[in-house]
């Protein structure tokens, strides 16, 4: 079973590390090409392209400039411990033990605009380059064209190594668009998380993101490998709703708190 999640805009390069083990990202040659493109942008251009403040644009111009491909624990950090958004609040990788990291390294992948695909222990240097950004590059008008089949091929390699051909899509739409489902050699399952609001169940972005992290942790902690095991997910008040679920879309609901 291969879990897919999105990266986060918020990064943490200060907290104590839960592990000293690390690996190197597998697509750094491609990342380097994107960095070369990004370095041609001025801070005001970055601000417009990403829709961010001047201060953040300056920070990211500096990050692009400082980025260099020889990753060490001194200049980079394991991806699963560097990302700090809502998904990662649910995941709580900082509390993983060695066996959890082992399982995650085999079964969890983070999609990334700059790095393509990251394994949990892959070192990464700080960046901001969302998959949906229209950064023109030698391969096309945006990052989807840049990555083409590369991300899908890398996921198929991981699936081949595991032998259980199931992908659990816990990534956002923006990021999953970088994957070619028809070329993915796996059964695709998408968990959906609905929260009750004024008597109706709907996707509430903040809760749904955290729930994706909770589900990822649930799979890792319990070493799940079969799709039917996912329906037991019951963290923080969620329950499986068989009636509205289908074989490839598992619906989990939670009553208003």
Swiss-Prot record:
| Superkingdom of origin | Bacteria
Q: Which GO terms describe its cellular component?
A: cytosol
Which GO terms are recorded in the biological process aspect for this UniProt protein? response to hydroperoxide
Q: Which family does it belong to?
A: Belongs to the UPF0246 family.
- What name does this protein carry? UPF0246 protein YaaA
Q: Which organism is it from?
A: Salmonella typhi
């Amino acid at each position: 079973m291969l879990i897919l999640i999105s990266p986060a805009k918020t990064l943490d390069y200060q907290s104590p590390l839960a592990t000293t083990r690390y690996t190197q990202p597998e697509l750094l040659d491609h990342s380097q090409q994107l960095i070369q493109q990004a370095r041609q942008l001025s801070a005001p251009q970055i601000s417009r392209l990403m829709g961010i403040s001047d201060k953040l644009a300056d920070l990211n111009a500096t990050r692009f400039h400082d980025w260099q491909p020889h990753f060490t624990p001194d200049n980079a950090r394991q991806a699963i411990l560097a990302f700090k958004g809502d998904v990662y609040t649910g995941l709580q990788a900082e509390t993983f033990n060695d066996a959890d990291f082992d399982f995650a390294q085999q079964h969890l992948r983070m999609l990334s605009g700059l790095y393509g695909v990251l394994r949990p222990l892959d070192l990464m240097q700080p960046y901001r380059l969302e998959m949906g950004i229209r950064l023109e590059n030698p391969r096309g008008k945006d990052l989807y064209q840049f990555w083409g089949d590369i991300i899908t091929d890398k996921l198929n390699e991981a699936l081949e190594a595991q032998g259980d051909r199931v992908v659990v899509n816990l990534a956002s739409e923006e990021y999953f668009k970088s994957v070619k489902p028809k070329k993915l050699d796996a059964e695709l399952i998408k968990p959906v998380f609905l929260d009750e609001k004024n008597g109706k169940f709907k996707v509430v972005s903040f809760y749904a993101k955290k729930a994706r992290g909770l589900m990822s942790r649930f799979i890792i902690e319990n070493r799940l490998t079969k799709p039917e095991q996912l329906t037991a997910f019951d963290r923080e008040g969620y329950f499986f709703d068989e009636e509205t679920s289908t074989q490839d879309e598992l619906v989990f609901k939670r009553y208003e708190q």
